[in-house]
Each structure stands twice: as structure tokens, then as C-alpha cells.
């Protein structure tokens, strides 16, 4: 989960953070039967919810997520990937998928390197772009009321989606990039990743079907998912069968 303040920008309605929650609510339904964990990140990353198949508990965790959770600003995607990798452990009889939802702005320099290391551990990464390339101002609120974030020169800060970086991160870990502005395609893409985690790598591509979310599926949910699926270990099964023979 990217919880940096830029996720409050309103180039996605009603804002990036809320849009992500609505989209991820549907994803939770698709991923039932898998273990899901949650990492939140801004200037740093930490494990917010360990891997679990308790979806009610997961939603309770998500209900508490805000951009105020971040002590340091930034977009530490590399740190988030490393945190997720540690949560997965070193088991080789399971396939793992990582879904990162972020605007990709102000990213750390080691994100691609972290993705490459994750790929060597068999982790496939899908990135979801939250925002638009045109961007939007970042709203803030203090005791004096509503305002926009200003830079050092006193000018409003416009936050823009860094799509290119998110595409590179996905490519480094054999994954695909999707836009949160096209929620149905993104859902189908993640579902495809889960269904095919044990079938090889993926080509990075971008899709463009723009389909609205259904109101009855607008639940609070995840930005960054850890998906762990038990793989069918054919070689292992054959070995055990031969030993019994």
C-alpha cells in the first residue's frame, strides 16, 4: 500500500487512495482461497498485516489505513518489495505474487534492483498505476482548514503518475503493469497472474478498457497484496510415488 500523501490527489475519483480501496475490494473476492498479506509504505515500508486467509481480519486492518500512517514521505517501493520478500520466506514449493499499487512518484533508487532479486526467488510482481500522467494537486488539511501542498517556493505541488517506473519494476520481475483508471482490466490481469504463477513469466503490457466498479463491491481493501498459492509439485509427487514403489 502506497500511503504517501500524494495518494490524496484527486486525479482519480474521488481520490487515489479511495479509488484503490474500491478496486481492491473486488480483488479480495477474487483471491479467496489464497493467503494475503499487507505492506504499507511511503518513505519506509513495514509489514502491516502478516499472510493470512482470514479475510474479515484483513478488512479490519484495511479500515484503519490512512496517509497519516507514514512517518516519512516518499515512495519506498524497493523497501516494500524487500519487506514482502521476507514475509514470503524461502520456501520453494510455493509460488508467490506481489501486487504493488502506487503512483510511483518520488520512488527510491533501488526499486528495480529489489524487483530483480525478488524474481530470482520466484516472485512475480504486478504493478498498478494509481493516478494520471496529467496529475493533480495534493490536498491537505490543518487546523486552519483545507489547502494544497506547496513547494519550497510556495507554489502548489502537482503529483503525476510515474508510469514508466512502474512498468520497469513489473518487467524486472516478469510481471505486468496495469492502470487503476482501467479497473476491470487490472482485476483480470491479477487474476491471470494468480492462475498462472506456476506456468512461467509474463510480458509487460498495458490495457485500456475503462469499466466502472459496481457500487455493491465498494469495500475498503488493499493497495499492496502478497499472494501465496500452494503449487502442485509434480516432481515431488512422482518422487514420493517412486519411493513407495
Where does each model-flagged region fall?
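Structural recognition of the beta-strand scaffold that forms the well-ordered cores
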Residues: 39, 100, 126-129, 178-179
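Membrane-embedded segments
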Residues: 1-96, 110-113
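VWA/integrin I-like adhesion module and closely mimicked acidic/polar interface patches used
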Residues: 71-75, 97, 104-172
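Solvent-exposed loop/turn segments at secondary-structure junctions
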Residues: 5-6, 43-47, 104-107, 131-135, ...
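C-terminal signal-anchor/stop-transfer transmembrane helix together with its immediate cytosolic
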Residues: 196-245
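Extended, hydrophilic extramembrane loops/domains of integral membrane proteins
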Residues: 166-196
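Short, hinge-like loop/turn segments at secondary-structure boundaries
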Residues: 54-57, 143-146, 195-198
Amino acid at each position: 500500500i502506497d500511503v504517501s500523501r500524494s495518494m490524496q490527489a484527486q486525479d482519480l475519483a474521488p481520490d487515489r487512495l479511495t479509488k484503490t480501496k474500491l478496486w481492491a475490494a473486488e480483488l479480495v473476492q477474487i483471491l479467496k482461497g489464497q493467503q494475503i498479506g499487507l505492506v504499507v509504505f511511503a518513505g519506509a515500508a513495514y509489514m502491516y498485516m502478516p499472510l493470512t486467509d482470514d479475510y474479515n481480519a484483513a478488512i479490519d486492518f484495511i479500515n484503519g489505513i490512512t496517509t497519516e500512517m507514514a512517518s516519512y514521505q516518499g515512495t519506498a517501493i524497493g523497501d516494500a518489495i524487500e519487506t514482502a520478500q521476507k514475509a514470503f520466506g524461502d520456501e520453494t514449493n510455493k509460488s508467490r505474487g506481489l501486487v504493488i499499487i502506487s503512483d510511483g512518484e518520488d520512488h527510491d533508487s533501488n526499486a528495480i534492483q529489489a524487483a530483480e532479486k525478488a524474481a530470482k526467488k520466484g516472485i512475480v510482481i504486478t504493478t498498478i498505476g494509481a493516478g494520471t500522467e496529467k496529475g493533480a494537486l495534493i490536498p491537505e488539511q490543518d487546523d486552519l482548514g483545507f489547502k494544497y501542498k506547496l513547494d519550497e517556493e510556495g507554489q502548489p505541488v502537482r503529483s503525476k503518475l510515474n508510469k514508466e517506473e512502474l512498468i520497469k519494476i513489473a518487467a524486472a520481475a516478469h510481471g505486468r503493469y496495469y492502470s487503476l483508471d482501467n479497473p476491470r482490466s487490472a482485476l483480470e490481469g491479477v487474476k491471470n497472474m494468480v492462475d498462472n504463477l506456476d506456468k512461467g513469466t509474463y510480458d509487460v503490457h498495458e490495457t485500456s478498457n475503462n469499466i466502472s466498479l459496481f457500487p455493491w463491491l465498494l469495500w475498503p481493501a488493499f493497495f499492496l497484496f502478497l499472494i501465496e498459492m500452494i503449487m502442485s509439485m509434480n516432481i515431488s509427487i512422482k518422487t514420493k510415488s517412486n519411493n513407495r514403489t
